[in-house]
Amino acid sequence: MGHEDAVYLAKLAEQAERYEEMVENMKIVASEDRDLTVEERNLLSVAYKNVIGARRASWRIVTSIEQKEESKGNSSQVTLIKEYRQKIENELAKICDDILEVLDQHLIPSAKSGESKVFYHKIKGDYHRYLAEFAIGDRRKDSADKSLEAYKAATEVAQTELPPTHPIRLGLALNFSVFYYEILNAPDQACHLAKQAFDDAIAELDTLSEESYKDSTLIMQLLRDNLTLWTSSEAETPARLMPLLRRRPLLRLPSRRRRAQG
């Protein structure tokens, strides 16, 4: 199959919500060992995100049910649920291993621009994080270590190659902070990372281009939402973090929209 046909079929599969087929078509594009266009990168990301997202949602639901049945002492149901959860985890692992192989063998070695390098290392960090969400013992530690390494590699490039308001840099900070909070159980580091990204972007908000304004401000609001959630209890929050939510006003999105429309 040719390059253009693979891209077209990936778009068609997206419209039809047949994301497994979208993945297969974008793997053909990714295997060409060249730096993908922005559109191609996004198609690849959307394809895998939908495939993995459905399984992650299923895993959370089944895990919640398992915990409820365990609390009730329903051992026979718990046995069935554990087997079913394992099936979902096997699917999750297969998807993660698949995209990580594509990244390591094709996309990361072929990345030329700083934007591409950040994008791919961020995705690598994301999918190792997804593995760490359900893995246990040494496997969890290995996935967490690899996720941390990938996020750090992405951050190193982002800080020199991308402005603080760039949506990919902001998205990296968002996901990296979630990694600290959920995987490493390090809320202090999570808050500091998210706060720094938010503050750096706020300082340069007026220089943000119109085409990326919507994406960037949305991610900034997600950073703000996480900070609000993570610092919601003053009794549990280090005192040095509490001024954060009192200092910064909410983003004034409507005024910028009026200027853009005018």
Swiss-Prot record:
SMART domains, per the entry: 14_3_3
Domain of life: Eukaryota
InterPro entries: 14-3-3, 14-3-3_CS, 14-3-3_dom_sf, 14-3-3_domain
Family: Belongs to the 14-3-3 family.
Name recorded for this polypeptide: 14-3-3 protein homolog
Species for this entry: Trichoderma harzianum (Hypocrea lixii)
